[in-house]
C-alpha cells in the first residue's frame, strides 16, 4: 500500500488520475474515448473498469461520465458503454452516462447461488440458496428493478470472468482458492449437467450472453489469477462447444429470447420456470419461449400456467 499519493484502494501501482485539477488530462482522456470508436479503428464501444471509483467525488464522477458519453456518442452513436459496477447502477443509467453494466447483481450472482449454492469467487457456500427458486426470482426482481429495461436487455450476462472463479469450478460446490486448495482441486467434482443449466439460462434470460473465453471449452479455475488459465487448444471439450452452439442457435431462432418480456411462471424448492414473450408487432413476429430448470436429482413435472 502507498501513502504518498492517491492510489485506487491504496494500491501504489494504480494511481488515481487528478481529473478535478487538470483540464488538460480531462480533455486528453475524452479524446482517447472518441479516437478508438472512430474510423479507422471502429471499436464497438468501451468496457469501463470500476467506473464508479473514478474521481474524488460523486459529482465529479457523474459529470465525467456525462462528458465521456457525449464524446463517444458524437464520434459513434452506436458505440456501447458497459461499466463494471457492484451495487445499484441506478444513478448512472438515466440515459446520460453508461448504457449498461457487467451484470453481476442481476445475473451472475443470483444464478450462481441458485445453481450451485456458491458465491461467485468460490469464497462462500450457502446451501439454503442452492435450488431456492423463490429466492432466485426475488433477487432478480430486486436487482433488475435498479436498471431501465433498455439497460437490462443489453446487460453483460456472464457465467464467469477474469475476476471470479470459473462457473465450471463453482459446480463442484467447494469453497477454495488457488493458494489454499491448489489448481487441481478446481477441476475435481465438477458437474457438466449443472454447467449446461447455466448456459441454458444465459441464452434465455434478458440481456446479452457473454461467454468468457474457455468456458465453452470446459476450462476450470479458482478466482483470479487461476480463472485466467490459457485456452486449451487441442484439448477442448467438443461436446460442450457444440452445446453452446446449439443454445446460441435457439436464442437466434426465437426472437422472444433476445427481445421479449419476462414472466416468472413457477418457482419452488429445486426448480424455476420462466417465459419470454414477444408480440406480433415486434420484428420477427409473435413468439414465446419457456425455460424450466430442475436442480434436483429426480424428475419433476410442472404445470405451466
Regions found by a protein language model. Give the residues of each.
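Active-site groove signature of glycoside hydrolases
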Residues: 30-57, 159
Amino acid at each position: 500500500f502507498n501513502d504518498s499519493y492517491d492510489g485506487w484502494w491504496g494500491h501504489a501501482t494504480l494511481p488515481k488520475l487528478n481529473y478535478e485539477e487538470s483540464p488538460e488530462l480531462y480533455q486528453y482522456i475524452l479524446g482517447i474515448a472518441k479516437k478508438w470508436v472512430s474510423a479507422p479503428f471502429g471499436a464497438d464501444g468501451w468496457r469501463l473498469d470500476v467506473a464508479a471509483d473514478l474521481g474524488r467525488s460523486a459529482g465529479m464522477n457523474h459529470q465525467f461520465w456525462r462528458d465521456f458519453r457525449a464524446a463517444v456518442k458524437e464520434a459513434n452513436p452506436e458505440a456501447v458503454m458497459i461499466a463494471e459496477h457492484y451495487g445499484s447502477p441506478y444513478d448512472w443509467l438515466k440515459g446520460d452516462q453508461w448504457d449498461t453494466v457487467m451484470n453481476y447483481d442481476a445475473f451472475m450472482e443470483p444464478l450462481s447461488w441458485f445453481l450451485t449454492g456458491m458465491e461467485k469467487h468460490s469464497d462462500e457456500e450457502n446451501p439454503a440458496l442452492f435450488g431456492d427458486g423463490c429466492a432466485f426470482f426475488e433477487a432478480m426482481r430486486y436487482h433488475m428493478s435498479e436498471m431501465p429495461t433498455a439497460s437490462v436487455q443489453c446487460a453483460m450476462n456472464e457465467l464467469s470472468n477474469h475476476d471470479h472463479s470459473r462457473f465450471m469450478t463453482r459446480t463442484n460446490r467447494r469453497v477454495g482458492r488457488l493458494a489454499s486448495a491448489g489448481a487441481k482441486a478446481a477441476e475435481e467434482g465438477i458437474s457438466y449437467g449443472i454447467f449446461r443449466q447455466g448456459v441454458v439460462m444465459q441464452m434465455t434470460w434478458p440481456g446479452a450472453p457473454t461467454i468468457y473465453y474457455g468456458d465453452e471449452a470446459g476450462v476450470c479455475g479458482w478466482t483470479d489469477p487461476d480463472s485466467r488459465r490459457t485456452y486449451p487448444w487441442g484439448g477442448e471439450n467438443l461436446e460442450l462447444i457444440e452445446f453452446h452452439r446449439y443454445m446460441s442457435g435457439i436464442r437466434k431462432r426465437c426472437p422472444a429470447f433476445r427481445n421479449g418480456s419476462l414472466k416468472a411462471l413457477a418457482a419452488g424448492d429445486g426448480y424455476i420456470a420462466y417465459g419470454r414473450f414477444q408480440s406480433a408487432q415486434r420484428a420477427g413476429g409473435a413468439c414465446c419461449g419457456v425455460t424450466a430448470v430442475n436442480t434436483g436429482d429426480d424428475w419433476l413435472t410442472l404445470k405451466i400456467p
